[in-house]
Amino acid sequence: MRPQFLKRYVIFFILLLGCLVFAYAQTADSVIVNQLRKEGITFSCNNSVTLLTSGQEKFDDLFKAIRQARSSIHLEYFNFRNDSIANLLFNLLEEKAQEGVEVRALFDGFGNDSNNRPLRRKQIQDIRRRGIEIYEFDPIRFPFVNHIFHRDHRKIVVIDGQIAYTGGMNVADYYIKGTRVVGTWNDMHCRLEGNEVNSLQRIFLRMWNKTTHQNIQGAQYYRGGLSDGHFIGLKPDPRNPAGHKMVGIINREPHTSNTIIRRFYTDAINGAKDSIKLINPYLTLNATLKRALRRAVKRGVKVEIMVSTHSDIPLTPDCVFYNVHQLMRHGVRVWMYTPGFHHTKVIMVDGRFCTVGSANLNARSLNFDYEENAVIIDRCTTAQLSHLFDRDKAQSFLLTQASWNRFRSPWKKFVGWFAHLLAPFL
């Protein structure tokens, strides 16, 4: 071989090796940030994130913040259940409205009507008379089929444009008390301070103006940065110093950003190198996500999933059980949470980043509804979630073929197989 050809081969080999080393050296968090930025998602690095790991923590923290509001309180929920917690909330909002604070609340029409204790028309009118602007997004009207999809499933609160809350919890007392059907109700929420509060405010005002045909806008609603200190007594961010977390908000809107959340989950799983921990209540999954999880196992990634043995709705859990059994057979470690219902929607990847938000891993959240998740690029917050995952493993059983046969009768296995055929509609 001529020397010049040998030299070219050596140079080519070195360049190829360098590309491979660079590709491997890219961490999962840098990959996901770059991919989301290509999708138009912005990230800021001056955020504080405080996890609220129970209904009691969430509502205690939220009510303390509302009591200290000075200018505006914006709430967007799938539903306000007509119970003791909602009554406390509306009484508190009435007090703030009488102080001159602007109070706006949105709820979803389907979310309200499908609730076993919905807000009735007279109650909504009474809430308005108390100074609270409250509106229903897309009320259910004939023909009802027109209103099945594109529901507002988000859970957002923004106070004074300075702090925001988001996660998996609506407004209901069962987040604290549990229910007779499922037992205790586990869920996750978080409080944000920093620039990404502005992102959540934009999401709220866009939906508010769409629903009410008003045109609410102005710099007074967008503060940015950490709060000015008038919110005291709230649960602190454990990171010291606080206010240096990278966060981006992924917002799914029908016809505008249809694929953003399913792309995030797919890219996060595909980019994992060491570990994936996933909790989601309605894990009906699509073929792409199932394939991504199986491939992660083949790459040597430790994949752990947690789902509940109890659920609040029919048929969907049968599909979930079928799916996790199939994943278990491909090497995924599946933990079956037994004390109650785990409604948490989180993923942790490589100990480097995580997400907290409203999106389930079912067809409704990934293909149809309005959803929103906070993507948190921070080892501290991810470690907190990972610790909670490991804590709940102690109250779960590991799915094996033997435990599967004890858990599901032949008839229930058939129901699960049938339910998984309906996954595109669940």
Which sequence ranges carry the predicted segments?
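Bacterial N-terminal signal peptides that target proteins for export
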Residues: R2-V10
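Bacterial N-terminal signal peptides
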Residues: I11-L20
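Charged, low-complexity intrinsically disordered terminal segments
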Residues: V21-L426
